[in-house]
Amino acid sequence: MSSPRHVFYISDRTGLTAENIGEALLNQFGNLSFKRHTHPFVDTPEKARAVVEKVNRSRQENGQRPIAFVSVVDDEIRRIIKGADAFQINFFETFLGLLEKELNTEATASEQGHHSIGNTKRYDARMEAVNFSLNHDDGVSDKNLQEADVILMGVSRSGKTPTCLYLALQYGIRAANYPLIPDDLESADLPRMVKPYRDKLFGLTIQPERLQAIRQERRPNSTYAKIDTCRSEVADAQSMFRRHGIPFANTTDKSVEELAVHILQACKLKRRF
């Protein structure tokens, strides 16, 4: 079996753009393996040269030309990175020229956009949403719950918390979540805490076998992790969702990104920034 191809994500900011687009492309080659290296905040010539050295060293040690996904605005830094011995996909160079042609004007590179009032507002909206989600995780508090954009419900370990945090971070959505415990599942009514907010509820379900595997890692050989317990809880939760007309999604084969988009569409929610 051949050694994994080395992949570098190089950015003058967080690296999330390079990672997201790069991963979407690499996922089309499921038969190959990759070793990933992320280098964020490459925003000076010195940092760029250091990254180039790492890329070239990887080429020498691995014997294969690395792949580099580059998201860098500054021309000088991009020029330095171009000197790396790698197959490079530079998002700004690839798409900026096409946009300039379509808009019939040249781009004016500026760092100002990174620190504009608009970005400050986006940051504030994101942090407010994250704090809200953390303060309303796992049903710990019903204070200001009426301010939630959506309230996720599901049995323990069905993916509620990561989905809430992703909605908050990526979309500024105030997402709370409530764990369905056995007492809730035995009742024909909705849990008292979330009952007033019926229109904001969205359910998460999961295949019992997958749920058992997750719970087994947390509490090995416990009643909590038994397959019969998982099957019963999942079935009861789905019955509750159907009985009260609560939309729900299966988290088993969905990424958190897919789940978030599905929830936004189903609940008719819009990004806050």
Swiss-Prot record:
Catalytic activity annotation: [pyruvate, water dikinase] + ADP = [pyruvate, water dikinase]-phosphate + AMP + H(+); [pyruvate, water dikinase]-phosphate + phosphate + H(+) = [pyruvate, water dikinase] + diphosphate
Listed GO MF terms: ADP binding; ATP binding; phosphotransferase activity, phosphate group as acceptor; protein serine/threonine kinase activity
Disulfide pattern: none
Keyword Nucleotide-binding annotated: yes
Keywords per UniProt: Kinase, Nucleotide-binding, Serine/threonine-protein kinase, Transferase
EC number(s) from the headed UniProt entry: 2.7.11.33, 2.7.4.28
The organism's place on the tree of life at top rank: Bacteria
Keyword Transferase attributed: yes
Residues binding ADP: G154, V155, S156, R157, S158, G159, K160, T161
Pfam family, one: Kinase-PPPase
Chain's role: Bifunctional serine/threonine kinase and phosphorylase involved in the regulation of the phosphoenolpyruvate synthase (PEPS) by catalyzing its phosphorylation/dephosphorylation.
Family: Belongs to the pyruvate, phosphate/water dikinase regulatory protein family. PSRP subfamily.
HAMAP family attached to this UniProt entry: PSRP (MF_01062)
Protein name: Putative phosphoenolpyruvate synthase regulatory protein
Annotated organism of origin: Neisseria meningitidis serogroup C / serotype 2a (strain ATCC 700532 / DSM 15464 / FAM18)
